[in-house]
Amino acid sequence: MVDNLPVRTHKHRSLTIEGYSRAAVQSYWRVPELRLGFDLGGAPWSFTGNPTVFITHAHLDHMAALPAFVARRRMMKMEPPTIYLPEQVLEATELLLKIWQRLDRGRMNCKLVPVKPGDSIELSREHLVTVFPTKHTVPSVGYLVWERRKKLRPEFVGMTQDQIRDIRLSGKEVSWEVRTPLLGDRKSVV
């Protein structure tokens, strides 16, 4: 693998957080186990396999490597990536990619998905991302990755599996969804 940009690694339980951030220079992070990344101020070769990227805002230190990332995935014959970004920057980003396509003479295939605070994005049965508002000098959003699990409702605890199955088959919901934010090395404060 080409070692072209600095990457720091932090393990948190079963997840790895890799990337680098230096204000006004570059910011790029990924969680390889979830196959997703955050921001593309740089695009280390090791990040090329991430099919999903969430862009927080359009400052260059967070988005300058978008064309290189998209082109690299094309060159490696990978599926076009899905890029989530603030809805206010969608049109300009589409134009940017069209210009790069013309300059590079290579297609800039990717799925650009505009987001706004309050949106939820399903990653898998176990994980979802919610979009929240942030304050910055340009349109921006933040992203929170949630792990979700089904828990048996308290009123059914102590029943046999057959009893619970019969209740579920009668149409009654026997479980509820528990969401836990993936906070890296921080704890939530309520």
Residue ranges and their predicted role:
Residues L34-L36, M108, R125-H127:
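Short beta-strand or tight-loop elements
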Residues L66-R72, T93-I99, L144-V145:
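Short, well-ordered amphipathic alpha-helices
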Residues K116-V190:
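Metal-dependent phosphodiesterase/nuclease catalytic metal-binding core
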